[in-house]
Amino acid sequence: MEALAAEVGRVFGCAIETGTVIEDLSFALDQNRQQYHSTLILDQLAANTPQHFLKTLAIAQVDLFIPILTHVYGEAQLGGTACVVSTFRLNESRSGLNIAPRYIERIVKEAIHELGHTFNLRHCPDHTCIMHYCRNEEDVDRKSDELCRYCKIMLEDEIKRLKT
């Protein structure tokens, strides 16, 4: 968590607090799919976020989905306050016994990506930009951990807007 907080703070230029917002995710479990509906988690996050938080990122170790996709690495409220990232599919070893060499790096990239959406950043066509949409772990590995020039400008503009 410390590495994640440091990287998020570096990209967004803000102080980071860590803690638990939601303990039990069973309310979002779809029994038929044996996956967790990420939109339901977002709704709870937004409702339970402390007032003094600008944004809230949840890191979940469960398999997330939205109804139109088989799985998602994360989901965010575009321009909102909440986002969630799943670590479940970012590790080649689902057993948790063998951690993929790039596991932490993938979590950091997806966390920054989802937080970017909360700052109104859309998916970017630049394959190296952290805001590029990823279909699989290889896509996550291929993109950098940085915003492209265009997305960086958009983020700076959004942060300025939020400060006024």
Give the ranges of each region predicted by the language model.
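The catalytic-center signature of Zn2+-dependent metalloproteases
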Residues: 93-163
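Metzincin-family zinc-dependent endopeptidase catalytic domain
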Residues: 1-111, 122
